[in-house]
């Protein structure tokens, strides 16, 4: 009998019942809640005269709608948009009513759901983790089975702590070799998406492995798993190892004492067996990956910074040619334009992909002693949580950013999506460390270019895209 993949093991450990139609009832260990996808779920509970079945499995925080400017210290009343204010207020009321732990808007622990749960130790290896947000795949970095769910499923989890799901296929993305200086986890995952496309992982749980992945910090692994959804995979995974254990140890929700020892022992099996069989295998050489920049309106429209935007006339596939033509028109680019000739109006460093302390350090390293270009209208840095913000300020990163001309903000989803005051105007180009570059994602008519934090900082000081390796002392240009 063939060995089991990590996904197989996690699935089997949580399978309550296999149903006649081939689906299974899966037990959920951790449920993360935010203000946008939960109001209807809580209302559904009330209408059915139900209560959350396991209160301590839930953790909540507002993130999508919250303002990131200092005015928000005034509380919910500082939220100008009435719908956004109502959603945040409703989350507070629902969590208060049912006794669910919530890090409210001005709690230092508040932040983006996919940042606060790991930093609290609420995401643990071997867990099943769900949230009403597609980037819940982030938590797979811990060797956890994590994915996004819809509002009706949020209600199901609150009421029963279970979900009905069908098992996916297994995909292995193996990245071997050493990353060059200036190349990051964000560049790895963008390169993967560029290689397999946004549908490449459809129907699969995507495990990332290989020496380059093992060398990544937990924050780098979270970045990669975060964007597995952009590669078409609902689930991203990295095997549990010593790096995982070291990150989790001592965090508020992590096991303590003898329970910690037992947990660490049990986590040793959270790896794919050597003889496990994957349905699909993709391989990349880390040493050949360069800093990446998305040029179009899909994450798969991505190139190395030293390349040129494609020419639709050179594409023989008529469907692909049309897609390139539409993307060029929306993005205001011309065929064969050098990536480094793309000028930026705004720069956004933040989001659940890249707003953790290591991301901010990488950006600050580039910003230090430099100034945001006069042609850049705005460059903002938005920490992923209040705790990340406090850590960055202890390290003096805020001063580096402010002296360089960046804005230093309060935590939240911010400019990743146009659901709060941070957004692009039509026609503006933005170097963004977020995860999606769809039309209108950052504001109607806004043009998003996905990059790493270091690349975003480099773009801010240059006013256009530049190979960050040119700014890193001792590395090849």
Swiss-Prot record:
Keyword NADP: no
Binding positions for [4Fe-4S] cluster per the UniProt entry: 352, 413, 416
GO MF entry, a single one: metal ion binding
GTP-binding is among the record's keywords: no
Keywords (A to Z) from UniProt: 4Fe-4S, Amino-acid biosynthesis, Branched-chain amino acid biosynthesis, Iron, Iron-sulfur, Leucine biosynthesis, Lyase, Metal-binding
Similarity-based family: Belongs to the aconitase/IPM isomerase family. LeuC type 1 subfamily.
Record's subunit section: Heterodimer of LeuC and LeuD.
Protein name: 3-isopropylmalate dehydratase large subunit
Species the sequence originates in: Pseudomonas putida (strain ATCC 47054 / DSM 6125 / CFBP 8728 / NCIMB 11950 / KT2440)
């Amino acid at each position: 009998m063939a060995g089991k993949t990590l996904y197989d093991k996690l699935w089997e450990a949580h399978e309550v019942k296999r149903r006649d139609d081939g689906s299974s009832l899966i037990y959920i260990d951790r449920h993360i809640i935010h203000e946008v996808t939960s109001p209807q779920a809580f209302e559904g509970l009330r209408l059915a005269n139900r209560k959350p079945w396991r209160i301590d499995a839930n953790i909540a925080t507002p993130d999508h709608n919250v303002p990131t400017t200092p005015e928000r210290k005034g509380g919910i009343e500082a939220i100008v948009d009435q719908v956004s204010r109502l959603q945040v207020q409703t989350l507070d009321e629902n969590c208060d009513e049912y006794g669910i732990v919530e890090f409210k808007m001005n709690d230092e622990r508040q932040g983006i759901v996919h940042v606060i749960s790991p930093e609290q130790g609420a995401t643990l290896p071997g867990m099943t983790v769900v949230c009403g947000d597609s980037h819940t795949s982030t938590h797979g970095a811990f060797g956890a089975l994590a994915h996004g769910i819809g509002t009706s499923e949020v209600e199901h989890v609150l009421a029963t702590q279970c979900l009905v799901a069908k098992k996916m296929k297994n995909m292995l993305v193996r990245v071997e070799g050493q990353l060059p200086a200036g190349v990051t986890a964000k560049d790895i995952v963008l390169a993967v998406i560029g290689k397999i496309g946004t549908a490449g992982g459809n129907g699969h749980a995507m495990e990332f492995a290989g020496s380059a992945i093992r060398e990544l910090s937990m924050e780098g692994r979270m970045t990669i798993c975060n964007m597995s959804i952009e590669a078409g995979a609902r689930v991203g995974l990295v095997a549990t190892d010593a790096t995982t254990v070291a990150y989790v140890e001592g965090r508020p929700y992590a096991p303590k004492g003898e329970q910690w020892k037992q947990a660490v022992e049990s986590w040793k099996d959270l790896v794919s067996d050597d003889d496990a069989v994957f349905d699909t295998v993709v391989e990349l050489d880390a040493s050949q990956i360069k800093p990446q920049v998305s040029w179009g309106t899909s994450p798969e429209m991505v190139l190395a910074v030293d390349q040129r935007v494609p020419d639709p006339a050179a594409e023989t596939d008529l469907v692909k040619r049309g897609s390139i033509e539409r993307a060029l028109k929306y993005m205001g680019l011309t065929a064969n334009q050098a990536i480094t000739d793309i000028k930026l109006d705004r720069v956004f460093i933040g989001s659940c992909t890249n707003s953790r302390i290591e991301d901010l350090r990488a950006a600050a390293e580039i910003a230090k002693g430099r100034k945001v270009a006069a042609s850049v209208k705005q460059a903002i840095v938005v920490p992923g949580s209040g705790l990340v913000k406090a850590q960055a300020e202890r390290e003096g990163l805020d001063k580096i950013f402010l002296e360089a001309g960046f804005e230093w903000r309060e935590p939240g989803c911010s400019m990743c999506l146009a659901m709060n005051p941070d957004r692009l105007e039509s026609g503006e180009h933005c170097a963004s460390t977020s995860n999606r570059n769809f039309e209108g994602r950052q504001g109607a008519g806004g043009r998003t270019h996905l990059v790493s934090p270091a690349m975003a900082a480099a773009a801010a000081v240059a006013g256009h895209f530049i190979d960050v390796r040119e700014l890193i002392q001792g590395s090849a240009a």
